[in-house]
């Protein structure tokens, strides 16, 4: 188990960095007007991967072994590396020239040169200030402790236990201190204020900008609700109908289809008409309606209902997420010397909020489900389930399946419905923030004008 945890941590670090860099590289390769299409294409890739991954993983788990869920990453990751090296030319150099330069650098390296040429004080300053080591450590530790508190609360420990309270309080305090450090202390300790590469993890000039805060809150809230829906849509079919992991994952196909359609449509509309906020609001409205419809999904729902209610969440995220990233990038002042760095920072912050919402959505959904399920089982006085943890109850249910309309089937259905109600709340808040987002849009040049990247306030 320890090896599994360490492996997942390493994979998560790489995966989160890949997503951010894909958007940064993709968006910088084209002009601003073509950027919506690039964002749409990348979003489609991530949306398909996010759904196809669980389906393939479920098939491996059901028919082979769960270890293949990890083995399959080796050829896929290797192919991705080869494609990247052969196609991306950061310095307009071919892959062979880059390899020759790297070999030349390594062959000419000696420890004596390193010892005399490298100033270790400057090296430490680079680690601390270029990578914002302290801000990153405080932020990461705070978020991890807070999420652990939500995970353990009501499951391994009671909510009023010292362990859970300590996790939650320390997590919040560390996260707040990371903001204080980045916003107010970083510049005071910075030994090279004029060095543009010495920047905090969260730059106050950008992060504290109301338009950027609002649009990233949209991303955070919608991703929180969406991931809760995705996780417990699969759990709905596994726990209530005893579907295998593979068959339960197949029910997510409607979301893939609608998400891809909406993402492509969003990119085309933004490129042709320059619209951003209308797409945000449209996506927010679809999200609220879709989340409301998902609360109608119970153990007595028909097959058509189970498929139909999963369509709108895909449409919602397809329209809203692309527009939110585009809106965040439009807030950059392009005539500043740091505009290129600001662009990377804003894109990375938007991706961070997306990842944070996805993570928190999974944890909060599990917390709501576990608390609801445990309380309902306790009130029902079901003898086989008394005195068991939620995980043990679920295991017993799967080993002693008694149908979807049994007492425990009804309890599971009601508990999952509570998760969907929570998701509806996040979508409603997301729609509220959509309404207050920036009105900036892309300017579409007239036919007799030279296309230029520009902004316009409406």
Curated annotation (Swiss-Prot):
Keyword annotations from UniProtKB, A to Z: Amino-acid transport, Glycoprotein, Membrane, Transmembrane, Transmembrane helix, Transport, Vacuole
Signal peptide stretch: none
GO molecular function, one term: transmembrane transporter activity
SUPFAM superfamilies: MFS general substrate transporter
Cellular compartment(s): Vacuole membrane
One of the GO biological process terms: basic amino acid transport
Transmembrane segments: 10-30, 37-57, 68-88, 133-153, 164-184, 206-226, 249-269, 278-298, 307-327, 416-436
Vacuolar compartment segments: 31-36, 89-132, 185-205, 270-277, 328-415
Membrane topology: Multi-pass membrane protein
Source organism superkingdom: Eukaryota
Cytoplasmic side: 1-9, 58-67, 154-163, 227-248, 299-306, 437-458
Record-level GO cellular component terms: endoplasmic reticulum; fungal-type vacuole membrane; plasma membrane
InterPro entries with a match to the protein in the record: MFS (IPR011701), MFS_dom (IPR020846), MFS_trans_sf (IPR036259)
Glycosylation sites: 195
Family: Belongs to the major facilitator superfamily.
Biological role stated in the UniProt entry: Transporter required for vacuolar uptake of histidine and lysine.
Listed name of the protein: Vacuolar basic amino acid transporter 3
Lineage: Eukaryota, Fungi, Dikarya, Ascomycota, Saccharomycotina
Gene that specifies this protein: VBA3
């Amino acid at each position: 188990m320890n090896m599994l945890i360490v492996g997942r941590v390493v994979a998560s670090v790489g995966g989160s960095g890949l997503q951010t860099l894909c958007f940064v590289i993709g968006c910088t390769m084209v002009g601003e007007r073509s950027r919506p299409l690039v964002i749409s294409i990348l979003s489609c890739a991530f949306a398909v991967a996010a759904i196809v991954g669980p389906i393939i993983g479920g098939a491996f788990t059901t028919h082979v072994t769960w270890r293949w869920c990890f083995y399959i990453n080796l050829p896929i990751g290797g192919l991705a590396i080869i494609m990247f090296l052969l196609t991306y030319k950061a310095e307009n150099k071919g892959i062979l020239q880059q390899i020759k330069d790297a070999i030349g650098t390594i062959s000419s390296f000696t420890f004596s040169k390193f010892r005399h040429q490298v100033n270790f004080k400057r090296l430490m300053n680079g680690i601390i200030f270029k990578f914002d080591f302290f801000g990153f450590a405080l932020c990461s530790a705070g978020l991890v402790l807070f999420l652990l508190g939500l995970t353990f609360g009501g499951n391994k420990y009671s909510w009023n236990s010292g362990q859970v309270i300590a996790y939650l309080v320390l997590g919040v305090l560390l996260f707040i201190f990371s903001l204080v450090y980045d916003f107010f202390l970083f510049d005071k300790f910075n030994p090279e204020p004029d060095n543009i590469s010495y920047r905090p993890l969260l730059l106050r000039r950008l992060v504290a900008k109301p338009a950027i805060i609002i649009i990233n809150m949209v991303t955070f809230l919608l991703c929180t609700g969406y991931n809760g829906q995705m996780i417990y849509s699969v759990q709905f079919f596994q726990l209530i109908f005893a579907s295998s992991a593979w068959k339960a994952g197949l029910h997510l196909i409607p979301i893939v289809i609608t998400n891809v359609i909406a993402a492509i449509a969003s990119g085309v509309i933004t490129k042709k008409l320059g619209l951003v906020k209308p797409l945000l609001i449209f996506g927010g409205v679809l999200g609220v309606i879709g989340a409301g419809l998902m609360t109608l999904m119970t153990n007595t729902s028909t097959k058509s209902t189970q498929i139909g209610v999963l369509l709108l969440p895909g449409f919602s995220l397809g329209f809203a997420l692309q527009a939110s990233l585009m809106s965040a990038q439009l807030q950059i002042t392009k005539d500043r010397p740091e505009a290129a760095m600001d662009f990377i920072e804003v894109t990375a912050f938007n991706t961070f909020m997306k990842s944070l919402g996805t993570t928190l959505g999974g944890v909060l959904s599990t917390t709501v489900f576990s608390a609801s399920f445990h309380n309902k089982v306790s009130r029902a006085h079901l003898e086989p389930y008394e005195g068991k943890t939620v995980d043990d109850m679920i295991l017993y249910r799967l080993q002693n399946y008694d149908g979807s309309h049994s007492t425990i089937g009804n309890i599971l259905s009601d508990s999952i419905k509570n998760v969907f109600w929570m998701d509806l709340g996040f979508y409603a808040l997301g729609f509220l923030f959509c309404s207050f987002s920036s009105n900036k849009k892309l300017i579409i040049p007239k036919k007799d004008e030279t296309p230029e990247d520009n902004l316009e306030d409406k």
